[in-house]
Swiss-Prot record:
GO terms for biological process: mitochondrial electron transport, ubiquinol to cytochrome c. The cytochrome bc1 complex contains 11 subunits: 3 respiratory subunits (MT-CYB, CYC1 and UQCRFS1), 2 core proteins (UQCRC1 and UQCRC2) and 6 low-molecular weight proteins (UQCRH/QCR6, UQCRB/QCR7, UQCRQ/QCR8, UQCR10/QCR9, UQCR11/QCR10 and a cleavage product of UQCRFS1). This cytochrome bc1 complex then forms a dimer. This is Cytochrome b. Heme b b566 binds at H97, H196. Heme 1 (or BL or b562) is low-potential and absorbs at about 562 nm, and heme 2 (or BH or b566) is high-potential and absorbs at about 566 nm. GO terms for molecular function: metal ion binding; ubiquinol-cytochrome-c reductase activity. Its main location: mitochondrion. The lineage of its organism: Eukaryota, Metazoa, Chordata, Craniata, Vertebrata. It comes from the Eukaryota. InterPro entries: Cyt_b/b6_C, Cyt_b/b6_C_sf, Cyt_b/b6_N, Cytb/b6-like_sf, Cytochrome_b, Cytochrome_b_C_euk/bac, Cytochrome_b_N_euk/bac, Di-haem_cyt_TM. CDD domains: cytochrome_b_C, Cytochrome_b_N.
Amino acid sequence: MTNIRKTHPLIKIINHSFIDLPAPSNISAWWNFGSLLGICLIIQILTGLFLAMHYTSDTMTAFSSVTHICRDVNYGWLIRYMHANGASMFFICLFLHVGRGLYYGSYTYFETWNIGVILLFAVMATAFMGYVLPWGQMSFWGATVITNLLSAIPYIGTTLVEWIWGGFSVDKATLTRFFAFHFILPFIITALVMVHLLFLHETGSNNPSGLISDSDKIPFHPYYTIKDILGILLLILVLMILVLFSPDLLGDPDNYTPANPLNTPPHIKPEWYFLFAYAILRSIPNKLGGVLALVLSILILMLFPILHMSKQRSMMFRPLSQCMFWILVADLFTLTWIGGQPVEYPFIIIGQLASILYFMIILLILPTISLFENKLLKW
């Protein structure tokens, strides 16, 4: 009798994806973040589902319902903080996953890469709408500021913003629709993840050397299942340390004040994972220019397959490109820091320089260095 795992139509799909999948023998811990993102998504959907059972999406009761979850629901505080800090873990894994892709040239699988960028946008949209739901001061003003950016679109801007708001300001209609979208998007993300994996399994995984590894493959199970379980345990350990010891470490104290349209907080800033993009947005004095730079700061990832000039795929054997890559990482840390600072000297100029450097490294310096390294190969 043939093994059911190889014949059953449904189990066969799981078998080809997670059990008998041929994987390169040399993929490092940087390849763990895909599975960690999957776990993050599952944690977020489950905790989010239980939160939605007790949450009310009405301006009068939203803040109180979150308080009720934390005070009165059994382990509600745990579910709420796992969801809030789970988002932070999600973004840490996302940034590391994207960084791995950039470093090792995984973007040459361009269908997989482009769906990944769309996924990044979808997760960012979901996180933004989720941040609005507790209806604290930073929720309200964050929603007001970010949705208002769309008014920079010529001709249709103002109409578009009022259409999204469902009125002339962020109010009940806005909160209700944000809750609806925040609920549905993770399931759309799950579908996109399946497409992401479908395209990845068409080509097989990349590996640190960037070379074709068809001649040296090992089965995914047990080697990488065990490796992934180790990663998952570490992820859960870090998440639970965050949740149980300092759940508010990454949050904003302003969000413990109920939303008040008559009182603007002195410093409006998003969650830490959006600060780099927020810094780029604020670096440009023009509204439309800022919005374009904000969108392009993420959309630029789609240009990497076109901008790849090197004869080698991975940066493993390209020390000059490695150097520029780590300068880019340092630049992103700088932008994240600036995004959380008030708009005053010297932060404005630092932010502007860091923003220029960000686009210059990606569009100009990395491709130029790659061409130079190609010349070095001939020495």
